[in-house]
């Protein structure tokens, strides 16, 4: 199937999934929710982004085309859950207990915070950094922040400071 036609079909699947998840949410909470606007402008490694105050969701077209089934079934409810939580509770932790409850109790899905898609095609240039336990690949933006001394990044596992792999030690 031609890519443009395939993309059109996937957009329809996303709209159907959004509508189904909205309907589940409205039945579960016994109230209506505003239908979000949807676009496909996200770039980089993010699969989707929810804009809470705009009631909008932006999806990554490339990751959608490369992972259609998982994208429709996991990413769409994930981003919609952020909007549902915002409409119910206002500003709370992005993947906090309210969001987790919507994912598990309303959508009957695991409350996974990150996708597992192969991001090689969308990743862009990376820079190798090391901590006490492993090598990390940082984006150009994070690398530049470190170089300009505007940010320090710590490993999520060992809490060690990330240092450039090619840094010359005194």
UniProtKB/Swiss-Prot annotation:
Source organism: Actinobacillus succinogenes (strain ATCC 55618 / DSM 22257 / CCUG 43843 / 130Z)
Superkingdom field: Bacteria
PROSITE patterns per UniProt: ZINC_PROTEASE
Positions contributing to Zn(2+) binding: 78, 82
A Pfam family the protein falls into: SprT-like
Localization annotation: Cytoplasm
Name of this chain's protein: Protein SprT
GO biological process: response to stress
InterPro entries recorded: SprT-like_domain, SprT_Zn_ribbon, Uncharacterised_SprT
Cofactor note: Binds 1 zinc ion.
Keyword Secreted annotated: no
Lineage: Bacteria, Pseudomonadati, Pseudomonadota, Gammaproteobacteria, Pasteurellales
GO molecular function: zinc ion binding
């Amino acid at each position: 199937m031609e890519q443009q036609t395939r993309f059109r079909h996937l957009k329809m699947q996303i709209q159907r999934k959004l509508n189904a998840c909205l309907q589940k949410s409205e039945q579960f909470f016994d109230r209506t929710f505003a239908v979000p606007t949807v676009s496909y402008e996200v770039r980089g490694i993010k699969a989707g982004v929810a804009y809470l105050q705009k009631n909008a969701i932006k999806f990554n077209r490339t990751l959608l085309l490369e992972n259609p089934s998982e994208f429709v079934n996991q990413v769409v409810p994930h981003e919609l859950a952020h909007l549902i939580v915002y409409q119910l509770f206002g500003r709370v932790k992005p993947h906090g207990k309210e969001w987790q409850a919507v994912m598990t109790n309303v959508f009957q899905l695991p409350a996974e915070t990150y996708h597992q898609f192969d991001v090689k095609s969308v990743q862009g240039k990376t820079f190798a950094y090391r901590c006490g336990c492993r090598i990390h690949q940082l984006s150009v933006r994070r690398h530049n922040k470190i170089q300009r001394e505007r940010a320090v990044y710590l490993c999520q596992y060992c809490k060690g400071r990330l240092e450039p792999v090619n840094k010359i030690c005194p």
